[in-house]
Amino acid sequence: MKYVVLGASAAGISGARQLRALDKDADITLVSKDDKIYSRCILHHYMEGIRDVKKLEFVEDNFIEKNNINWIKGVSATGVDVNKKYVTLENGNSIEYDKLLIATGAHTFFPPIPHLKTAKNSIGFRNFDDCEKIMEMSKNCKNIVVMGAGLVGIDVISGLLHTDCNVSLVEMQDRMLSIQLDKKAASVYEEAYSTKGVKQYYEKGVKELIVDEDGNIKEILLTSGETIPCDLLICAAGVRANVEFLQNSEIECDKFGLVIDTQGKTNAKDVFGAGDVTGRNPIWPTAVKEGIIAANNMCGINSEMTDFFASKSTMNFLGIPTMSLGINTPPDETYQIEIESDDDGNYKKIIHKDGKIYGAILQGDLSYSGVLTQLIKRKIDVSK
């Protein structure tokens, strides 16, 4: 049996590992644009100097050899022929498969602002190459602007605090980490980053990028009319699934990404998908689970992804531990809110309705986070 796995991050690696565990004699080929196996979630630790390249890895040293995997690294897939069952690569080669797992992840989304994608000093923050470029470029910068205050944007800012640069954050929402946190919890981080010298602009978007004769961004004009000097612009305004190479195939994609069912199957025979390439539930644990589920079904073991509770985020920026579960604001007035806080920086917010908990935010003391996770995930009625 010939298995081909596209992508060497959470979904692809967990899928390849599971394939080998279930089929000791199979031919397994792993294809990835990355030439390293590393966790994107902790790239900012590399920027900060807290971890070296080795400590970014999430597999054992001899993972490839131990699992007898043929790894074609530093190469992207350019197409899939589902009838003849082969994948074409950017180096001109092609690989035949019996079963294919697509786990190509996602890439930085650049909003349609003139010069944003073309300027030499504009970059995303998605992979190791981005990280190294930012580290190198920041050495010759005075002013760095990060666009987007989601988890990726805050990761970047955290990785830049040790530099001598002036760091600014621009966000269209009214607070930092708006998907994960309410205004109270977000304000704690906002104040903490402010004391570190980070200038923050909320409820403001980028209206125009002012460039020099070489096309480099020198200044950013906000929708408020304010301007920010800029030597390096880092875009953290979201991601898009890596499905461009599937455009001429018969594999179904929608506006989010690759379409799969609960078994990881696509509409094409013997083609499976997992992880961020689907554009849904873009968190690490979900990608790992989807990779395993897909591998099981590729090997004929009937498995389904039943756990779609992806609204869980744990963070610890600037030594402030926080966990967000489910919704962070009530959808309407039928929901009730319970809030506890103290002078030690501990904050707890519970959103409930008819005896069931739909969301929670814990900051500082994360006790009972495990219990709350299960109550929300299983929709347990706590009123009984």
Q: For each of these PLM feature ranges, what is it?
A:
Residues 6, 95-105, 228-238, 291, ...:
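Short hydrophobic core segments
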Residues 7-11, 126, 147-152:
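Glycine-rich Rossmann-fold phosphate-binding loop(s) that bind the pyrophosphate
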Residues 118-141, 212, 216-221, 226-296:
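FAD-site-proximal beta/loop scaffold in flavoenzymes
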Residues 1-69, 159-180:
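Beta1-alpha1 glycine-rich phosphate/pyrophosphate-binding loop at the start
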Residues 133-181, 217:
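Rossmann-like NAD(P)H-binding beta-loop-alpha module
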Residues 1-2, 8, 277-370:
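Mid-to-C-terminal Rossmann-like scaffold of FAD/NAD(P)H-dependent oxidoreductases
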Residues 25-27, 71-89, 95, 163-256, ...:
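A Rossmann-like FAD-binding core segment of flavoenzymes
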Residues 42-71, 183-206, 321-323:
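N-terminal glycine-rich dinucleotide-binding loop that anchors FAD/FMN and/or NAD(P) in oxidoreductases
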